[in-house]
C-alpha cells in the first residue's frame, strides 16, 4: 500500500515506519494508517472468496532481505498472517486453487478507497466504520457486476474521448491526439490544485 504520498513513503522512513496500521476481516485487508489520528479515509483490498492466508507486512511477505520479484511467502507456499503495526504495510492474499486441465475459475480482487464523515469514523473504540466498504464490495462481488462496471467505464471514456477525432494517416499521431492528449487534459482538470499526483 502507498501511505497516500508515494514520494514521501519512499524516503521519510523515520516517520512512515512508525505509522502503518491495518485491520483484517476474513478475506479483506483494511489499510487504516493514520485514520485514527488525522485522516477520514482508508484503503481496502479484498477477494470475493475465502483466503487461505494473508500478510500485511512487507518483511513477512517478501522476507527480510527479499523483494517482490521472489517473495518469501510465494516460495513457502503460504503467507504468515502478519498484522502490520508500523513498518511497511502490504496487502497479500493467498488462495490455494487446483485446476484440472482445461478448467477455469474466476476470482475477483478489489482495491478501493473509502471516506467517512468525521462523526462516522468508528463503530466502536478503535474499530473503523466499514459500512461504505461493505457496500462497495457488494457492488463488485460477481463477474457480471464487474463486467457491467467495466462496460460503463468504457462507455464513459469512449464518449469523453470521441468529441474530437483525428485521422491523419499517422497511427502514432492519431493515438496521441485521440487518446493521450485528451486523457491528459482530463487528468489535469481533475488533479488541478492537488498537492500530489500519488
Where are these regions (language model features)?
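Substrate-binding groove/exosite segments of carbohydrate-active enzymes
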Residues: 84-89, 103, 155-198
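Polysaccharide-binding surfaces and accessory modules of carbohydrate-active proteins
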Residues: 1-76, 91-93, 118-162
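Gly/lys/ser-thr-rich phosphate-binding loops in alpha/beta enzymes
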Residues: 86-88, 95, 106-107, 122
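Short Pro-Gly-centered flexible turn/kink motifs
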Residues: 97-115
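Beta-strand-rich interaction surfaces with strong enrichment in secreted/lumenal proteins
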Residues: 81-84, 94-99
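Residues that cap or initiate secondary-structure elements
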Residues: 3, 113-117, 172
Amino acid at each position: 500500500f502507498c501511505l497516500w504520498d508515494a514520494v514521501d513513503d519512499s524516503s521519510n522512513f523515520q516517520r512512515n515506519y512508525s505509522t502503518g496500521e491495518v485491520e483484517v476481516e476474513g478475506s479483506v485487508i483494511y489499510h487504516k494508517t493514520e485514520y485514527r489520528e488525522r485522516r477520514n479515509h482508508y484503503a481496502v483490498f479484498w477477494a470475493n472468496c475465502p483466503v487461505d492466508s494473508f500478510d500485511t507486512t512487507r518483511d513477512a511477505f517478501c522476507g527480510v532481505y527479499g523483494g517482490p520479484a521472489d517473495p518469501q511467502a510465494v516460495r513457502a507456499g503460504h503467507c504468515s498472517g502478519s498484522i502490520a503495526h508500523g513498518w511497511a504495510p502490504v496487502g497479500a492474499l493467498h488462495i490455494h486453487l487446483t485446476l484440472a486441465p482445461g478448467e477455469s475459475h474466476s476470482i475477483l480482487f478489489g482495491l478501493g478507497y473509502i471516506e467517512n464523515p468525521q462523526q462516522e469514523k468508528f463503530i466502536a473504540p478503535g474499530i473503523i466504520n466499514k459500512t461504505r466498504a461493505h457496500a462497495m464490495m457488494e457492488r463488485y462481488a460477481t463477474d457480471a457486476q464487474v463486467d457491467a462496471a467495466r462496460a460503463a467505464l468504457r462507455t464513459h471514456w469512449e464518449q469523453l474521448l470521441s468529441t474530437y477525432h483525428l485521422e491523419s494517416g499517422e497511427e502514432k499521431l492519431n493515438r496521441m491526439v485521440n487518446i493521450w492528449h485528451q486523457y491528459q487534459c482530463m487528468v489535469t482538470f481533475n488533479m488541478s490544485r492537488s498537492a500530489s499526483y500519488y
